[in-house]
Amino acid sequence: MSGHNRWSKIKRQKAAMGATKGKLYSKVVKEITVASRLGGGEPSGNARLRVALAAAREANIPKDTIERAIKKGTGELEGENYEEVTYEGYGPGGVAILVECLTDNRNRTAADMRSTFSAYGGNLGAEGAVAWMFQKKGVISVKYGPSEDQLMEQAIDAGAEDVIMLGDEGSEVRTAAADLHTVAGRLQESGLPLGQQRWVFLPQNTVALDVDTVKKLLKLLDALEENDDVQNVHGNYEIEDAMLDSLLQ
């Protein structure tokens, strides 16, 4: 597995336990609220809400918490009016970074992003500075299953674009952004044990980094993800597995 994918997986695992579990809950609940506000509270007619609800189940968020989040989005309960904002910038080593946020105070979040990038060796860019380097895709985690050839055949038949094998950690099925829910449904019908479903921004090209730059970059990524307004952080970095292993020891 590439260092980029492994680091992303490690971050998701860390978010599912310990002190960061509450932060994961908050992010998922925010997404449910916004998805409900934009597309309505019925999952059958709201693909974004379906993906958010799948993330809530994966995170074991209580049903009543989910229902309140939906009602806040539809206006049945009073709640914050979150705005979607994506910030773009560069990190150490010239790594391009996209930061997806949901905020109730755009000015506060912009100031936080600017100061965080600056404090950790990066700089916040203008809109469009790095977005062109990424493509939005759907990603479906498969916990275990058939051989690579069999999984590839099933995935392509279901409408997927690619399959990435992750060794003992299962595999990822990648789809066009608009096809995420459709492909996931077809794979589930075929009996595959699916995990998380999500949209990601995948880099078209990656930047290889030395160990000192990786250390600086990981500090920036951690700082960005600690911000309560941040939902997702994407970068075009590539970290060698051996290097990542040594840094995590």
From Swiss-Prot:
Compartments reported by the entry: Cytoplasm
A single Gene Ontology CC term: cytosol
Pfam families reported for this sequence: TACO1_YebC_N (PF20772), Transcrip_reg (PF01709)
InterPro entries: Integrase-like_N, TACO1_YebC-like_2nd/3rd_dom, TACO1_YebC_N, Transcrip_reg_TACO1-like, Transcrip_reg_TACO1-like_dom3, YebC-like
Keyword Transcription regulation belongs to the record: yes
Cystine connections: none
Keywords of the record: Cytoplasm, DNA-binding, Transcription, Transcription regulation
GO-annotated biological processes: regulation of DNA-templated transcription
Similarity comment text for this entry: Belongs to the TACO1 family.
Name of this protein: Probable transcriptional regulatory protein MXAN_4974
Organism of derivation: Myxococcus xanthus (strain DK1622)
